[in-house]
């Protein structure tokens, strides 16, 4: 199964305040394609909280010359929709941000199948003391830089590619553009 890992880092607590996106396509454990973009947040959400900055290390200055999400969306969308399924660790968080940013920019409708790798890990490893991405990566012997969008996306896809994904764990994300 071809999986596409997706991860966002955010500038603040507002839904849609994406400041970094990582996307990695993995098939049979091999990375086929990977991309990361620093994103200048939408003008209505254009501020960086200390809390978020301390988590991912991205500063407002890092984003000053970065494109807005609408400029990179086509590339991200192509990768997402080329995969059989998108793997997202704690999918509700990232999908809430994706839905809001698509709406803010009035971007065209999109849909894709996805699996929440957090739920998948809870299913396969109920005894684990934590199901966070870094703990699961340790369990699989993977090293990565946590809270780096590209590293998180790639690690998520690699973990999901090594696990059986029950049919009922696959969900559908649908964003319908408002007319």
List each language-model region with its residue ranges.
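Short alpha-helix plus adjacent loop in nuclease-associated cores
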Residues: 114-131
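Acidic, Mg2+-coordinating catalytic module of metal-dependent nucleases/exonucleases
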Residues: 83-102, 131-179
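A mobile, often basic/glycine-rich helix-loop segment
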Residues: 103-108
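Ser/Thr-centric signal marking residues that sit
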Residues: 8-10, 117, 156
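Conserved non-catalytic scaffold segment of RNase H-like nuclease domains
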Residues: 1-100, 111, 138-147
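Functionally engaged cysteine thiol sites
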Residues: 19, 116, 135
């Amino acid at each position: 199964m071809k999986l596409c890992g997706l991860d966002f880092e955010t500038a603040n607590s507002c839904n849609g305040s994406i400041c970094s996106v990582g996307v990695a396509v993995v098939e049979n454990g091999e990375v086929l394609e990977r991309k990361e973009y620093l994103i200048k947040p939408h003008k209505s959400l254009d501020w960086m909280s200390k809390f978020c900055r301390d988590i991912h290390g991205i500063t407002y200055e890092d984003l000053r010359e970065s494109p807005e999400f609408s400029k990179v969306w086509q590339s991200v969308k192509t990768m997402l929709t080329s995969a059989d399924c998108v793997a997202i660790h704690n999918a509700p968080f990232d999908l809430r941000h994706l839905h809001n940013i698509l709406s803010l920019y009035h971007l065209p409708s999109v849909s894709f199948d996805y699996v929440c790798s957090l739920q998948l890990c809870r299913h396969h490893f109920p005894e684990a003391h934590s199901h966070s991405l870094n703990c699961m990566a340790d369990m699989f012997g993977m090293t990565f830089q946590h809270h780096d969008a590209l590293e998180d996306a790639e690690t998520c896809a690699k973990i999901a590619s090594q696990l059986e994904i029950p049919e009922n764990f696959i969900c559908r994300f649908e964003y319908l553009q408002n007319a």
